[in-house]
Amino acid sequence: MPTTFADSPTRFVSAANGIDYAYRETGEGARPLVLLQHFRGNLDNRDPALIDVLAATRRVITFDNAGVGATTGTTPNTVAAMARDAVDFLDAMEIDQADVLGFSIGSFIAQEIALSRPAAVRRLVLASSAPQGAEGMHGWAPDVIEAVGSRVPGPEGVLKVFYAPSPASQQAGQQSLGRIYARTDGRDKATTWETRLAQYDAVCAWGIPNHPLLQRVSAIKVPVFVANGDSDPMILPHYSYLLAGLIPQAQVKIYLDSAHGFLFQHHTEFAADVEAFLND
């Protein structure tokens, strides 16, 4: 098994739902850590530095959900349907139980998996997340949409949303982008505009204020680590505290001078925190 993300080839697995899922595996271990990706992200939009630190002690699996990147099928426009597609991937991989790390929209999907298939999740990490039905989550601010929602988002938009405006955070963002773009062979297919539209519809529906749905997340009984950057403009940090307060076995950490991409900027610290949490 490859020990670095840069050396991990893209493989495919066929699921019972008729979808061929693109995925990569890095590291070794009995129980996998499955990663669920952010808005518009494919296999290549993860910082290899984070994957490599996580994979030093465990088997890490990254994959494109239905309709994303090289995976076949169509991206649905609800989080619940995305979670069903993710569970179909786990079944195709013959993974009965995993630790799950969801980032951004991937954290919404991770919550839904923990609620709909609780036996499949041992421990849950929710990065840049919010509970369904939270007030103020129905859509993003115009400057955020302009930065990451355009037809061809560039590095300037990523730096604006994923990193704090400080020189240190912006420099860390440039370094992370350099690592992400370093892979030249076997790169994933770009995420389509149709997937972008479907994912944003799902995010907006997740954020419709609804108090009964807000309470749903309290049914998650596994240990949960909630994390975010202190300057995230996409999913504001106070939602991390709300989420952790609703989940019985949750802990929360906010990383300083960072934003939506805090886990890339602080990859060493975050990976160490995840390692300690998963081994607790």
Predicted region positions:
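Acidic catalytic loop of the alpha/beta-hydrolase fold
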Residues: 231-235
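Short beta-strand/loop motif that positions the catalytic acidic residue
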Residues: 220, 226-228
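Hydrophobic, aromatic-rich cap/lid helix
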Residues: 9, 187-213
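Gly/Ala-rich beta-loop-alpha elbow adjacent to hydrolase catalytic centers
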Residues: 102, 106, 110
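Flexible "cap/lid" loop of the alpha/beta hydrolase fold
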Residues: 115, 122-154
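Active-site loop/oxyanion-hole signature of alpha/beta-hydrolase fold enzymes
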Residues: 61-101, 272
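Conserved HGGG/HGGXW glycine-rich cap/lid loop of the alpha/beta-hydrolase fold
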Residues: 15-72
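Catalytic active-site module of serine/aspartate enzymes centered on a nucleophile-bearing elbow/loop
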Residues: 250-280
